[in-house]
């Protein structure tokens, strides 16, 4: 373990169009090979598709989706006397958001469809309605934590 001082958290600047930090984080996650303008176009197109289909505020749908995807508990491997236990741990807010974004974009990429904007929009709308692959991943994570509740006393 490092003996250096704790690193300072970087402040994520909000995005240019909606002035939203969470959206800026999403754009950075969608980005591949440093192509940020393309990633931004994909995310904004996805929000336009959501607005077109639902008729409601796309930022509200987006934030609801992220809130629904954020896990409360996860399991971490802990080695105790030759055996490895899956120990349930509470998820900190920053990590929970990061996991939610990772799952959202991962399952959007796996979807079959024409463009990434359409796939991302569909995954966001599904997550807001508590369906879809990313929600299933969150439920699996919670189920794993529940199944391994007996090892909660190994928390560190």
UniProtKB/Swiss-Prot annotation:
Pfam families documented for this protein: Ribosomal_S7
InterPro entries per UniProt: Ribosomal_uS7 (IPR000235), Ribosomal_uS7_bac/org-type (IPR005717), Ribosomal_uS7_CS (IPR020606), Ribosomal_uS7_dom (IPR023798), Ribosomal_uS7_dom_sf (IPR036823)
Gene Ontology CC: small ribosomal subunit
Keywords for this protein: Ribonucleoprotein, Ribosomal protein, RNA-binding, rRNA-binding, tRNA-binding
Function (record text): One of the primary rRNA binding proteins, it binds directly to 16S rRNA where it nucleates assembly of the head domain of the 30S subunit. Is located at the subunit interface close to the decoding center, probably blocks exit of the E-site tRNA.
NCBIfam families: rpsG_bact
Record's protein name: Small ribosomal subunit protein uS7
UniProt gene name: rpsG
């Amino acid at each position: 373990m490092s003996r250096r001082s704790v690193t300072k958290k970087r402040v994520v600047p909000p995005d240019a169009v909606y002035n939203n930090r969470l959206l800026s984080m999403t754009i950075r996650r969608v980005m591949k090979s440093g192509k940020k303008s393309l990633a931004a176009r994909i995310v904004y197109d996805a929000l336009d598709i959501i607005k077109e289909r639902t008729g409601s505020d796309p930022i509200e749908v987006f934030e609801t989706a992220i809130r629904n995807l954020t896990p409360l508990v996860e399991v971490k491997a802990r080695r105790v006397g030759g055996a490895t236990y899956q120990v349930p741990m509470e998820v900190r807010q920053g990590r929970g958001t990061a996991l939610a974004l990772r799952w959202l974009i991962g399952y959007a990429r796996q979807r079959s469809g024409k463009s990434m904007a359409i796939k991302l929009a569909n995954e966001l709308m599904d997550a807001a309605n508590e369906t879809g692959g990313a929600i299933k991943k969150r439920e699996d994570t919670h189920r794993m934590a529940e199944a391994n509740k007996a090892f909660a006393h190994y928390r560190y």
